[in-house]
């Protein structure tokens, strides 16, 4: 089941979320916006099972990676109107 995965620019490039993902949804890509020169990316969201282990592994206070489960996304879209 595909879920929406959003990586925010508060990512520090630590790779914790990538290592925590049991289905290999995340990978690191080059980015000059942080000291590590890399940021998490979610190229395979169709494999996301919604376990949110990536969120739990994120050491930033900003929760740089967020998984929006299908029902959460639908609910959020309804509030936008």
Curated annotation (Swiss-Prot):
Binding locations of [4Fe-4S] cluster 2: 21, 48, 51, 54
Necessary cofactors: [4Fe-4S] cluster
GO MF terms held by the record: 4 iron, 4 sulfur cluster binding; electron transfer activity; metal ion binding; oxidoreductase activity
Membrane topology: Peripheral membrane protein
Source species, domain of life: Eukaryota
GO cellular component, one term: chloroplast thylakoid membrane
Cofactor, free-text remark: Binds 2 [4Fe-4S] clusters. Cluster 2 is most probably the spectroscopically characterized electron acceptor FA and cluster 1 is most probably FB.
Binding site for [4Fe-4S] cluster 1: 11, 14, 17, 58
Main location: plastid
Cited InterPro entries: 4Fe4S_Fe-S-bd (IPR017896), 4Fe4S_Fe_S_CS (IPR017900), PSI_iron-sulfur_center (IPR050157), PSI_PsaC (IPR017491)
Matches recorded under Pfam families: Fer4_7
Tagged with keyword Transport: yes
Ranges for domain 4Fe-4S ferredoxin-type: 1-31, 39-68
PANTHER family, A to Z: PHOTOSYSTEM I IRON-SULFUR CENTER (PTHR24960:SF79), PHOTOSYSTEM I IRON-SULFUR CENTER-RELATED (PTHR24960)
Name this protein carries in UniProt: Photosystem I iron-sulfur center
Source organism of the structure: Welwitschia mirabilis
């Amino acid at each position: 089941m595909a879920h929406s995965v959003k990586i925010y620019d508060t990512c520090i490039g630590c790779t914790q979320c990538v290592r925590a993902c049991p289905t290999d949804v995340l990978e690191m890509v080059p980015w000059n916006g942080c000291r590590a020169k890399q940021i998490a990316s979610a190229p395979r969201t169709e494999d996301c099972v919604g376990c949110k282990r990536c969120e739990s592994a994120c050491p930033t206070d900003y929760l740089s990676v967020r998984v929006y489960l299908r029902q959460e996304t639908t609910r959020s879209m309804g509030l936008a109107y």
